[in-house]
């Protein structure tokens, strides 16, 4: 029966993958309340054109709230076609809004006012206001029919806005009152407009017309489109057949914006993107149609130019040629690396490869390039990761999805029936054999329960256990499987304290340590890797947490007023990570730890901050993270310097290195044989020196049975003289959002760095950290110029892990970097071995890198 939970686990992981949208913003997921009903939007950000009295002011227009007189009510009755009255909400930052909710004034049964209809106006800058319209041009939305029911309305298409106005509409003179809520999520792209040539018409054989215009563009439209957003940012990716559409009741071709080669005199289409501020760009993803049988292909090359604020376009463009695909007609995302270029505007020229070029989505992975030191710390909450009752599943492509799920379920049921039938007959045979043998002999077992463990295939002695990972099992369908039906005994049950732990990501102890010198791996069943402040959390043995739970934190309390905030590095559901500068840190640090600066000089530190509105579980997890960090004492692991836990917001202060993370550091450098004379280089010796330090830090973590779970160059900080320290907040940074795969809002996974067993079985171990080290080593020797498996989509990466599991020689490995010697690439390949017990330990990796350095 061990296969049944395994197969169900794999199905559980794959179902969200099958149904997940391919666009960066998925309207089916981005449906979180933005703070009217919950109170996160403050009163001063809710304004109105007028109010009937102080008790019906704008601040009382919160959905499902009975404060004041129960709603916002304008001063005078609303007249037909008189659109002067409005309720306005300022979100302070751009948001992707997919749903609105309205309600009238009930006031405990005393109110009878409501708005039967309303319009939505929105603005991204507070000056230019846009009237929302649906895909057929209708602007008026149906409102409430009574004063108490909540009426939810999908915005199709969704909008990107900072300011939103609700404008009540009536067909006769009447008093109206409104309570409202907005649903959506933060608009992380930062894109405020794109300018492009207007889309065109595709005429099919027979005369049918496919309209490929941007029908919901909210800017000016003529021969070109200017100062607006539309279908390229609506979160809906087009189908393989551009004559079909995801959306109901719209015309064929709606999902795509398309251009004909003849309309472009230079052989390319130029699109200019304007952003909210200067940003650091990692990648651009373009969803393209490739129905080459109808003359449609992805672009053959793109050239992108960059501009900061009102300056001229920079002359050195990024050029990215593509390998055309004349075999697979599927639509796909094309990822274009932007090499951390800084800009507030990007102009891209997409070159035709055939008669037509069609796009359905364009997204950017970026982070703000700088932060204003005088800005107040943000207080707006992040979208919760818990299940939202408003969440709706994208019903597009429903029949195909249902067919796939039904087929998978039938296959699983058939396998389960076969296994149960086999076990039934096996028990019958066992009973018969027992009856025959009971008169002849008695079999008794005297193995001590605290020093033996049974695998699925055989009983194991202590010496055997130490060398086997607990997920390296022999499956029943393999010929070498033998079931010891007469000798299987029940495993000892866990005590309640061992079975459950209050710290997310804690490893459950599966066996005692073997003899000294025999390595074993800590093992954890983990789905969500993210901590409360957005970074990954270490997977820690339960026995270690039990020891830490009774200890006080041996770290000094630091005066909060001495922190000077420089930049926000990242954020999570309940907290943020900031880059700060402090003076006088030497008075508070551990006496055994030396700061890498001269005395009395300011020190750069990373501050993890828990927001004051965090719940009790988040606070407990944050304090446990402090206890874990306080135990880490290694020169290649960031050090916990001090804490601020006497009052809110709780903070932990850790080291930060002057050269930032290794990913950005290497992307600013080139190999020593580079032809560029104006770019700094890093020698092969220094690359190996940094890799050796990463191995040393991971060797220390593995000695504690700690599992990092997100080892990558983005989580390695670089100091003076190429010193390296391993950190844990890369996951919180929007700059690296493209490195993570989000499964229906439940988990954020770095799948391009994860081992096959981590993706398919949810197993995170020291062995899976070894796999990630191999990918990190590959990043280092490629100078972080591209993502691992950049030629594969996220779905193809997951498919490739299945090939590693099947081990039939069809798996794809990362290629050998140009400056990487054979010995180092051989080490990488050993980290990616299918069987975990065949991968090297970090002690072996560290020793091997040291020996190579001495050659």
Curated annotation (Swiss-Prot):
Disease per record: Spondyloepimetaphyseal dysplasia, short limb-hand type: A bone disease characterized by short-limbed dwarfism, a narrow chest with pectus excavatum, brachydactyly in the hands and feet, a characteristic craniofacial appearance and premature calcifications. The radiological findings are distinctive and comprise short long bones throughout the skeleton with striking epiphyses that are stippled, flattened and fragmented and flared, irregular metaphyses.
Variant or mutagenesis effect after changing residue 752 to C: In SEMD-SL; causes retention in an intracellular compartment and thereby abolishes signaling in response collagen binding
Residue spans, topological domain Extracellular: 22-399
Signal peptide region: 1-21
GO terms assigned for molecular function: ATP binding; collagen binding; protein tyrosine kinase collagen receptor activity; transmembrane receptor protein tyrosine kinase activity
Annotated glycan sites: 121, 213, 261, 280, 372
Organism of provenance: Homo sapiens (Human)
Taxonomic lineage of the native organism: Eukaryota, Metazoa, Chordata, Craniata, Vertebrata
Intrachain S-S bonds: 30-185, 73-177
Subcellular location, principal: membrane
GO biological process terms on file: biomineral tissue development; cell adhesion; cell surface receptor protein tyrosine kinase signaling pathway; cellular response to angiotensin; cellular response to hypoxia; cellular response to transforming growth factor beta stimulus; chondrocyte proliferation; collagen fibril organization
Expressing tissues: Detected in osteocytes, osteoblastic cells in subchondral bone, bone lining cells, tibia and cartilage (at protein level). Detected at high levels in heart and lung, and at low levels in brain, placenta, liver, skeletal muscle, pancreas, and kidney.
Protein name in the entry: Discoidin domain-containing receptor 2
